[in-house]
Amino acid sequence: MAEKFIKHTGLVVPLDAANVDTDAIIPKQFLQKVTRTGFGAHLFNDWRFLDEKGQQPNPDFVLNFPQYQGASILLARENFGCGSSREHAPWALTDYGFKVVIAPSFADIFYGNSFNNQLLPVKLSDAKVDELFALVKANPGIHFDVDLEAQEVKAGEKTYRFTIDAFRRHCMMNGLDSIGLTLQHDDAIASYEEKQPAFMR
């Protein structure tokens, strides 16, 4: 079972860039591992650091600004997560500490992979995202309340509605990944296997 996502309140960091691809999110040289942990250290590596080894932080990159340390909600522009279909991208985001990404649109494969990894991708219109960028930049350190059950983002004095597919919403709220969904039918699977001839088991 994965961690359930129902509501989250977190610090928001504004990444004011469109078409952020998966190679920017987690560069290919860090993809050797097959476990989900450890990728956060290399999130946005080529932007966060001035050296290849990731030891010299880039002071001009927003994730390195002191006021955004500990951010768990990423505000971005359109077509977030485009490029190759590596699942390491949501792994890196969640390992870094992000729970939510808000953007006008997402690449389809990244969007699906996010749900599989309990990272909530929230789609809002360009105009609403513009409002949120203005709000965050005027109020560094602001927190948003994200309510998956109500499908709402509360930011400042305003509430923004979003829509998530009912099945994906159910899975996130109940902490069900692909394995968890399969285990829900464990008894039925065991019963089926018992009925099979011995040579097929």
Curated annotation (Swiss-Prot):
Cellular component (GO) terms are: 3-isopropylmalate dehydratase complex
Question: One MF term from GO for this chain?
Answer: 3-isopropylmalate dehydratase activity
Q: What class of enzyme is it?
A: lyase
Q: Does the keyword Amino-acid biosynthesis apply?
A: yes
Q: Looking at the keywords, is Repressor present? A: no
State the Pfam families in the record.
Answer: Aconitase_C
User: Any idea of its EC number?
Assistant: 4.2.1.33
Record SUPFAM superfamilies: LeuD/IlvD-like (SSF52016)
Alphabetically sorted, this entry's keywords are:
Amino-acid biosynthesis, Branched-chain amino acid biosynthesis, Leucine biosynthesis, Lyase
Q: Alphabetically, which GO biological process terms does the record hold? A: L-leucine biosynthetic process
| PANTHER family, sorted | 3-ISOPROPYLMALATE DEHYDRATASE SMALL SUBUNIT, 3-ISOPROPYLMALATE DEHYDRATASE SMALL SUBUNIT 2-RELATED-RELATED
Tell me its family.
Answer: Belongs to the LeuD family. LeuD type 1 subfamily.
- Function, please? Catalyzes the isomerization between 2-isopropylmalate and 3-isopropylmalate, via the formation of 2-isopropylmaleate.
Q: What is this protein called?
A: 3-isopropylmalate dehydratase small subunit
Species: Escherichia coli O6:K15:H31 (strain 536 / UPEC)
| Taxonomic lineage of the native organism | Bacteria, Pseudomonadati, Pseudomonadota, Gammaproteobacteria, Enterobacterales
